[in-house]
């Protein structure tokens, strides 16, 4: 089957995120090869792992980290933290969307999602003593004051991209629901970590300003966003993806919350691969990672699934999918696998699988394994350690590059905030 080409090098403007790319593809009528997807259902009685995983499936095989593995993860966390510390503005706390390693001081737009990861990174840096005592808290105060008083918002939701010093909207970007949610997750993490009355006051002011009911347009489903030029975006958060954090925040809000039945309103599509069934989505592996970076779904389930087990299954499926590609791309192996939305040699690509999505070319994306550390600890640790030892050009002062291709000897010159952030958070989640 010919794969749908999802590179966006021909799409004007630098501000397209992975969600915007997916919206662009759908709007352009691109047909994605979703073979293997089962009909929409209302869930299943057992978790995907216990109901469908074949005997011997190696899922979640590490319970205790060795001293060596813990030190390796600390190296990863400390390097990743440096991105947020150095690429975050000391004046505003806004974190650059990406950084070119060849010219790290060049001007770049900040993203509210990277800033949300950055707020969480400050908690980790404070706990791990990556910065002097009090330094992280000072940066948190600067960020929260800027978010409350100066960063433009609409009904409490923030524009996706902004000037890191002035807060001015950039690239005609949208007021983004999911990116605001990531920012709020970082905000709540700071409130709970520092337990400082002034931090809590600012955090609650920002949280209570968000009008969730407005963005739902009197329905149960949130839109992807809004712009002053066109109003609400047509896409809605209506099927499984990184949306879980959105709806948990919205239903738990003190002001303008969404009703509890919102949780049952979005669809859960059932996929099957190699005898394993799981709830999946029209998107790469990152959708199984983001909500679980902040919300602990372990040993919990609703009437549909155990979502932690579901992400474990989805990650194992992705690992097997990559190994199946070994004949085409011999570098893919038990020691090196993982594809999710990332840079490529020819531009930004939303790729992954199964089913195969995007023009897969042998590239490896560190955040695929790094963002899945709690789900397959042994397998993902093996991959990350292989990257650093056998592919030293994949390792930088900010941790791993965004992507690299061993077959073509190509290494990205950029680090992207949200991808470095998910590695940092999931490494910390595995350790603690």
Give the location of each predicted region.
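Signal peptide processing junction and immediate N-terminal pro/mature segment
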Residues: 37-52
């Amino acid at each position: 089957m010919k794969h749908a080409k999802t590179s966006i090098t021909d799409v004007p403007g630098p501000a397209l995120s992975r969600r915007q790319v997916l919206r662009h593809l759908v709007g352009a009528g691109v047909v994605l090869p979703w073979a293997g997807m089962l009909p929409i259902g209302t869930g299943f009685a057992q978790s995907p792992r216990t109901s469908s995983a074949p005997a011997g499936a190696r899922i979640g095989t590490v319970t205790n980290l060795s001293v060596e593995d813990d030190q390796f993860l600390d190296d990863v966390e400390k390097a990743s933290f440096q991105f947020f510390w150095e690429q975050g503005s000391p004046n505003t706390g806004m974190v650059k969307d990406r950084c070119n390693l060849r010219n790290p001081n060049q001007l770049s737009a900040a993203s509210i999602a990277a800033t949300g990861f950055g707020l969480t990174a400050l908690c980790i840096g404070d706990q791990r003593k990556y910065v002097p005592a009090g330094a992280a808290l000072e940066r948190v105060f600067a960020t929260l004051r800027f978010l409350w008083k100066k960063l433009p918002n609409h009904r409490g939701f923030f524009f996706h991209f902004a000037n890191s010093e002035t807060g001015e909207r950039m690239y005609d970007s949208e007021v983004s629901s999911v990116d605001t949610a990531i920012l709020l997750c970082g905000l709540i993490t700071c409130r709970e970590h520092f337990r400082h009355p002034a931090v809590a006051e600012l955090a609650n002011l920002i949280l209570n300003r968000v009008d969730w009911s407005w963005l739902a347009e009197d329905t149960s489903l949130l839109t992807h966003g809004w712009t002053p030029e066109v109003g609400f975006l047509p896409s809605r958060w209506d099927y499984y993806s990184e949306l879980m954090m959105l709806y948990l925040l919205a239903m738990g809000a003190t002001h303008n919350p969404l009703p509890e039945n919102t949780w049952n309103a979005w669809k859960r599509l059932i996929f099957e691969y190699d005898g394993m069934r799981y709830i999946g989505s029209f998107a790469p592996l990152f959708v199984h990672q983001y909500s679980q970076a902040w919300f602990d779904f372990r040993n919990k389930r609703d009437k549909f699934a155990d979502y932690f087990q579901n992400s474990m299954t989805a990650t194992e499926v992705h690992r097997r999918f990559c190994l199946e590609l070994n004949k085409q791309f011999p570098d893919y192996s038990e020691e090196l696998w993982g594809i999710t939305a990332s840079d490529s040699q020819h531009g930004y690509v939303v790729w992954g699988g199964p089913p195969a999505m995007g023009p897969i070319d042998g590239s490896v994306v560190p955040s695929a394994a790094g963002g899945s550390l709690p789900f397959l600890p042994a397998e993902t640790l093996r991959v990350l350690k292989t990257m650093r030892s056998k592919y030293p050009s994949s390792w930088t002062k900010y941790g791993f590059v965004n992507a690299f291709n061993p077959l073509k000897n190509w290494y990205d010159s950029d680090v992207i905030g949200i991808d470095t952030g998910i590695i940092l958070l999931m490494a910390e989640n595995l350790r603690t």
